[in-house]
């Protein structure tokens, strides 16, 4: 039975899958990547109530100003932009979300109502990396 889905931590706060070959393999093998913690344990929204030890490396302060700029320009929340950023990737990343907050769920749905430009996408990637993209 072929592998058709791979769940991996992917977000603006966790870029490993972009550089370690994970998303490249997904594209080549036609595997759908599912992003767990796509909002960095809530840090991309209003903040996290608690982080897992592996999530203590998150540094949202690097990219939140750029994320807020794109969100303001589009008239949507940073949650919508962060998820739209994942959805724009050619590997067709599927974010795995969980929330009991109705507004966060509405914000997440907004991500499917627009598409980031290539410039916006790379602006966010550059901010998240903390250095220019080669």
Where do the PLM segments sit?
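Beta/alpha (TIM)-barrel catalytic core signal, keyed to glycine-rich beta->alpha loops juxtaposed to Asp/Glu
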Residues: 1-134
């Amino acid at each position: 039975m072929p592998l058709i889905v791979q769940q991996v931590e992917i977000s603006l706060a966790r870029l490993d899958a972009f550089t370690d070959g994970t998303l490249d393999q997904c594209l080549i093998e036609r595997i759908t990547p599912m992003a767990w913690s796509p909002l960095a344990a809530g840090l991309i929204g209003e903040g996290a109530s608690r982080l897992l030890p592996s999530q203590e490396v998150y540094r949202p302060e690097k990219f939140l100003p750029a994320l807020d700029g794109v969100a303001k320009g589009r008239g949507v929340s940073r949650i919508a932009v962060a998820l739209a950023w994942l959805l724009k990737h050619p590997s067709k990343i599927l974010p795995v979300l969980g929330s009991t907050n109705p507004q966060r769920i509405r914000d997440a749905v907004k991500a499917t109502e627009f598409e980031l430009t290539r410039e916006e996408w790379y602006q966010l990637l550059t901010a998240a990396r903390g250095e220019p993209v080669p």
